[in-house]
Amino acid sequence: MKGFYLLLVAVAAIGGGALWYQSQRNVAPPAPSAPLPVAAADAFHGFTLGSASAPVEVTEYSDFECPFCASFATVQMPVIREQLIATGKLRWRFRDFPLPSHQYSRYAAMAAQCAGEQGKFWQMHDQLFNNHQWAQTGKNPRSLFRDFARASGLDLDKYDACMDGQRYAARLDASIQEGDALGVRGTPSFFVKGRPYTGRGTSDDFKALVDSLTKTHK
């Protein structure tokens, strides 16, 4: 474990959070011992990629409107998927943390949740981040997100019903409250073994982290 902590310190010193999007939330963080909200403790704890038996798991708190989240998703994540997730070394867990300063981030999160209902979360995730121009226009993205849903192979009638009914509002609230309880204040934020990871968040950094943790537990 000593190697793990030394690596976190070293990476933090090198990176300084280059991919960190800080936006202060208006709520004070609860005491570390405060229990998570009841709604956050249900059976759903985020969408995952990778084997459940992977030796290392990373939890990402992300905002679909966040430009640094989009950069991470389109530049770093494809390498992480190929080199770490597909090879069974890493499991990735995605949690929503739409920031209140972003007008349509919660709507985007809802679109991804509704896609997840049809088993297409990661397809919608990629559509939202790969076509991130929507986040810079300031225009209501409702029709564009519906196009993303179509491109993701969704049943549009089911998608529309889910969006109109705000079916996963409570789930999003629970994810945000869980992030608040952990002290998340910006996106993307990463947690490894329940501890915040403060490195640059590059694919090389995560590879080094996985290698270190894997060696530690051999």
For each of these PLM feature ranges, what is it?
Residues S23-V38:
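Ser/Thr/Pro/Gly-rich low-complexity linker/stalk segments immediately outside membranes or between
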Residues F44-H45, D96, H132, I176, ...:
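Short, well-ordered turn and helix-capping elements at secondary-structure junctions
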Residues T48-L49, W134, Y197:
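Short clusters of hydrophobic/aromatic residues that line enzyme substrate/ligand-binding pockets
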Residues A54, S62-R150, D155, L182, ...:
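Structural alpha/beta surface segment adjacent to cysteine/selenocysteine redox centers
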